[in-house]
């Protein structure tokens, strides 16, 4: 049997397409209706895609390569623009420059810098080594770090700024009396205030050891831990001020309180001072169990420390470390011992009794008065830290303070071990930027006390990660009035700020008031507070109505007032 296979049903048939032959040119002979009246301009595939206008044929600033992007097909006028005067669409445009908000200023600054920056392997650029690794030279690394900080400051990039906490919680029953902003306080001036007149002097001072003037980076000396008691007694707890208030003066304070008020325009952190008005007399006090006596670190820096409290580089822990260093340094540089000579004032230390056998720090108290005009007489307790014997035999009283270096990389500062011996001015200038408020308060205290010299010590950590061991790298001395001029500190302005606050309180009724620096704004506020406020702060547990009392983080000594 045979089968016939029909292959015609399995394969499709081929139909010849109709080909149009255009004798006059190329392309189709007939144009569909959908493409009629559509302008056409010849183009080249080499032309840039997405260009809106053809600028290359009209003007070109680069004469050497004026035909660099030119095309023979881009000269048509199908898409040319012809201006027609149509006044119906005419309207005015506001050409005033719009002020950008602060968070948008400098957004594209780094983009502009990257366009004009140097290329790879060029001078100041990147150095490329094998295996695809890119490194920076040591000089370029140091030069790049400040630029990073500037980008964060001016471009507002990175995390938002950390809000500081107030030194005391403002309560609902406090009445705000006055707000004083810094621009207004800076303009105040009270000239022609004479040097204070001594009322009485107390305490005992030890003599300065001149061998510490020869210390340098190559001949450093370890900082010792000296177990001595330092009294930080407030105004109303001072028995001498209580005695003097009966006959002399109508405004009473300590040098630390006065320096805080006088240098308030340089402060960034929050602080508070309690003021009591009794009749025509004013008493300025600091609250107990607070951080008023702690020394701030990098308070006025562009990037102040913001670590957590658990870190040794947190603002509070750095302040405790700086206070610990300052107390120990001021006692170590003195000639100690029973056989060494001492300078004794008229009266003994008013804060210890004769039967107490304790080691007290070398401090001399000078009670002085100033006449501020309008029957205002200020009485304050000032302090000296040491005394220096001159060749003529006359003693020179010293105010001894210490600057501390904690981590130059984190603090955006200069390394003391590299710059202190050769460029001490650069180190001091950097400290004036980072610790302007602290240095100003030290200077004011030295001027008020009448110190002949202000001794500054440079103390650094042995290891940046170890906050318990330090070394002395050098010392420097200044005359207080000359140093005040050098750091642009005006005593006339300082007296003006103090007089302004005194006048405000004098106008109020008798009672208790509180002056506080706003933690995040350059403003000082004066509050009228109830008379029983902060009375519970004197309890034995050290806790007041503001919560937990002041406690030391590091156990530098057994007593909170010891060093």
From Swiss-Prot:
It comes from the Eukaryota. The keyword Phosphoprotein applies. Pfam families: eIF-3_zeta (PF05091). GO terms for molecular function: mRNA cap binding; translation initiation factor activity. One of its GO terms (cellular component) is eukaryotic 48S preinitiation complex. InterPro entries: eIF3d. The modification Phosphothreonine is found at residue 128. Residues 291-305 are annotated as: RNA gate. It is found in: Cytoplasm. Residues 100-121 have a biased composition (Basic residues). GO terms for biological process: cap-dependent translational initiation; formation of cytoplasmic translation initiation complex; regulation of translational initiation. Keywords: Cytoplasm, Initiation factor, Phosphoprotein, Protein biosynthesis, RNA-binding. Residues 98-167 are annotated as: Disordered. mRNA cap-binding component of the eukaryotic translation initiation factor 3 (eIF-3) complex, which is involved in protein synthesis of a specialized repertoire of mRNAs and, together with other initiation factors, stimulates binding of mRNA and methionyl-tRNAi to the 40S ribosome. The eIF-3 complex specifically targets and initiates translation of a subset of mRNAs involved in cell proliferation. In the eIF-3 complex, eif3d specifically recognizes and binds the 7-methylguanosine cap of a subset of mRNAs. Belongs to the eIF-3 subunit D family. PANTHER family: EUKARYOTIC TRANSLATION INITIATION FACTOR 3 SUBUNIT 7, EUKARYOTIC TRANSLATION INITIATION FACTOR 3 SUBUNIT D. Component of the eukaryotic translation initiation factor 3 (eIF-3) complex. The eIF-3 complex interacts with pix. The RNA gate region regulates mRNA cap recognition to prevent promiscuous mRNA-binding before assembly of eif3d into the full eukaryotic translation initiation factor 3 (eIF-3) complex. This is Eukaryotic translation initiation factor 3 subunit D-1. It comes from Drosophila virilis (Fruit fly).
